[in-house]
Amino acid sequence: MPVNDNNLIWIDLEMTGLDPERDRIIEIATLVTDANLAILAEGPVLAIYQSDAQLALMNDWNVRTHTASGLVDRVRQSALDEEAAVAQTLAFLADWVPAGKSPICGNSIGQDRRFLFRYMPALEAYFHYRYLDVSTLKELARRWKPEILSGLKKNNTHQALDDIRESVAELAYYREHFIRL
């Protein structure tokens, strides 16, 4: 397990909604890549227990999506709270990237960071203050070179580990087809 300052930490959360003042994290997954986006390790994929009362606050889209994926059942059966999920995730990350070195990486990652700040501050603090947000490139490509977007295929399972893998692949796609190196 080579600890390396240049490794990148990718994270995805599934939540009961988009408002960190009202909604909660129900799944977290992480993976680590090297600086060239080769996946080095996949961290734990953790369903986080939330009460039926909290789950009942989900809108129709979240109920439909997270029920179809099996996540709602996994959340109900989980014995993990946010603190336990943070401990497992930090233990994994410490083997790959020193604290404060990696930007937080993912798609629309600012949204995830808002939830981390609210519910998992120790994990949020592990990241460098910078962001590596793949959705920035998606928005630029949409405006500057929209024809390349048709070559990008995503499954949109809204399962945390699948979503991270797709984010890494999406950044690699933009590197090949959009960014001139």
Curated annotation (Swiss-Prot):
GO terms for molecular function: 3'-5'-RNA exonuclease activity; nucleic acid binding. Coiled coil: none annotated. The active site is at 129. GO terms for biological process: DNA metabolic process. CDD domains: Orn (cd06135). Its EC number is 3.1.15.-. One of its GO terms (cellular component) is cytoplasm. 3'-to-5' exoribonuclease specific for small oligoribonucleotides. PANTHER family: OLIGORIBONUCLEASE, MITOCHONDRIAL. This is Oligoribonuclease.
